[in-house]
Amino acid sequence: MINGLKNYSQDALRAARYIGQGFFVTLDHMNRTPITIQYPYEKLIPSERFRGRIHFEFDKCIACEVCVRVCPINLPVVDWEFQKSMKKKQLKSYSIDFGVCIFCGNCVEFCPTNCLSMTEEYELSSYDRHELNYDQVALGRLPNPASKDPLVHPILGLGYLQKKLLTQSTESKTITNFDKS
């Protein structure tokens, strides 16, 4: 009888401890700032090396087609004609279909004239897939930087990230560049 009562009290204390631990975890999660954002109204600032939409500078392109050769899916469409008078290629048109692009960045990395660059634009969705086929004019437009976008609100107080990450990270502008008000 005494052993049974002793075991019962030990089990009750162990159960209370487990319930207390679970309750402590719940309270800890309730005190944290949520990591999610309200996307259309708040936007994350992409990191410095983010691979977004490709920007193309028509005047720098020499129509060498290196971008087509290094692309895993041979995506960029380069149309050129040979100018006999100048004895070099003349670029006529350049286009990329972002509905097919895998944003690997090989074209940007291997371009000898640096006429291709990655932007921080990530809002490419559309209802018509043909709108994702960008020609040289659409590729030449620079998007507004996300850091200057009035809709971007930095995420404040990501308290459960380690302090080292907040101070050492140069990759994530969202975490390090916030107002301390």
From Swiss-Prot:
Q: Which cofactor does it need?
A: [4Fe-4S] cluster
How does the protein's chain sit in the membrane according to the entry? Peripheral membrane protein
Q: Which top EC class is named for this enzyme in its record? A: translocase
What's the catalysed reaction? a plastoquinone + NADH + (n+1) H(+)(in) = a plastoquinol + NAD(+) + n H(+)(out); a plastoquinone + NADPH + (n+1) H(+)(in) = a plastoquinol + NADP(+) + n H(+)(out)
The residues covered by the 4Fe-4S ferredoxin-type domain are 52-81, 92-121
Keywords in alphabetical order, please.
4Fe-4S, Chloroplast, Iron, Iron-sulfur, Membrane, Metal-binding, NAD, NADP, Plastid, Plastoquinone, Quinone, Repeat, Thylakoid, Translocase
**What InterPro entries does the entry give?**
4Fe4S_Fe-S-bd, 4Fe4S_Fe_S_CS, NADH_quinone_OxRdtase_chainI, NDHI
| Source taxon at top rank | Eukaryota
GO terms for molecular function, please?
A: 4 iron, 4 sulfur cluster binding; iron ion binding; NADH dehydrogenase (ubiquinone) activity; quinone binding
Q: Where is this gene product found? A: Plastid, Chloroplast thylakoid membrane
Predominant cellular place of this UniProt entry's protein: plastid
The free-text cofactor remark is:
Binds 2 [4Fe-4S] clusters per subunit.
GO BP terms, alphabetized: photosynthesis, light reaction
UniProt entry tagged with the keyword Nuclease: no
Tell me which EC number(s) this protein carries: 7.1.1.-
What do the Gene Ontology cellular component annotations say? chloroplast thylakoid membrane
Which residues of the sequence carry a binding annotation for [4Fe-4S] cluster 1? C61, C64, C67, C111
For the ligand ([4Fe-4S] cluster 2), the binding residues are C71, C101, C104, C107
Member of which family?
Belongs to the complex I 23 kDa subunit family.
Relate the protein's function as given in its record: NDH shuttles electrons from NAD(P)H:plastoquinone, via FMN and iron-sulfur (Fe-S) centers, to quinones in the photosynthetic chain and possibly in a chloroplast respiratory chain. The immediate electron acceptor for the enzyme in this species is believed to be plastoquinone. Couples the redox reaction to proton translocation, and thus conserves the redox energy in a proton gradient.
HAMAP family, per this entry?
NDH1_NuoI
- Complex formation: NDH is composed of at least 16 different subunits, 5 of which are encoded in the nucleus.
What's the protein here called?
Answer: NAD(P)H-quinone oxidoreductase subunit I, chloroplastic
Provide the organism lineage as a comma list: Eukaryota, Viridiplantae, Streptophyta, Zygnematophyceae, Zygnematophycidae
